[in-house]
Regions:
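Amphipathic alpha-helical "coupling" segments that flank catalytic cores
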Residues: 1-181
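Single conserved hydrophobic/aromatic residue that forms the stacking wall/gate
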Residues: 179-189
Length: 189
């Protein structure tokens, strides 16, 4: 927050100062997310850099501990993307961020970095969908065709299915699909 005030005082553009102020948003599950383009960009790239850096040195949350708030950071990425109604190529950002570490001479120890980050973000997306009261079977179907490059689209599909599934039309469609569809993945696509 203070960085935004300092940058404005030093004559930086208001959008840049706002982005600096909002780079750590959202700070919790129900707090606001940045909305302006510079703010969204800085917030997401800062969080991606943080995740790549910590996962790169094998500092990951355990099932009971997350002292670096990496789960909150991942949810911040997910919420910022979804609430701004964007599909970003998160896999490309993860790759680019890890290459920047290499370019600067930092040897990231974790050889499974990309896969672990993808799994971690997928798990956080599962948590986000549960928090939005999406049915378990719809969450699993959504995750079966999931890509980090289409978080917003995946969320919209899950939300739509969740809304329709208990209507008469949804019940009828579900009955038909039980006999014709080989897997939940075919339904969600």
């Amino acid at each position: 927050l203070m960085g935004g005030y300092f940058s404005e005082y030093q004559g930086f553009d208001k959008d840049i100062s706002l982005a600096i102020s909002e780079q750590y948003l959202p700070i919790g599950l129900n707090s606001i997310v940045p909305k302006k383009p510079f703010s969204v960009t800085l917030s997401i790239t800062d969080k991606i850099d943080t995740l790549v850096g910590f996962f790169g040195i094998n500092e990951q949350p355990t099932s009971s501990k997350d002292p670096l708030a990496l789960r909150r950071i991942a949810l911040g990425i997910i919420r910022t993307i979804i609430e701004n109604r964007k599909n970003l190529k998160i896999n490309d950002l993860l790759n680019y961020s890890s290459r920047l570490y290499d370019d600067q001479g930092y040897n990231l120890e974790n050889k499974d970095l990309q896969k672990e980050l993808q799994d971690f973000l997928k798990d956080r997306f599962r948590y986000y969908l549960k928090d939005k009261e999406i049915r378990y079977d719809i969450i699993e179907a959504t995750l079966s065709s999931f890509s980090l490059n289409n978080l917003f689209s995946s969320f919209e599909k899950a939300k739509c299915l969740n809304k329709v599934i208990n209507t008469q039309i949804g019940i009828d469609i579900n009955s038909c699909l039980l006999y014709t569809s080989p897997s939940p993945r075919d339904v969600i696509q």
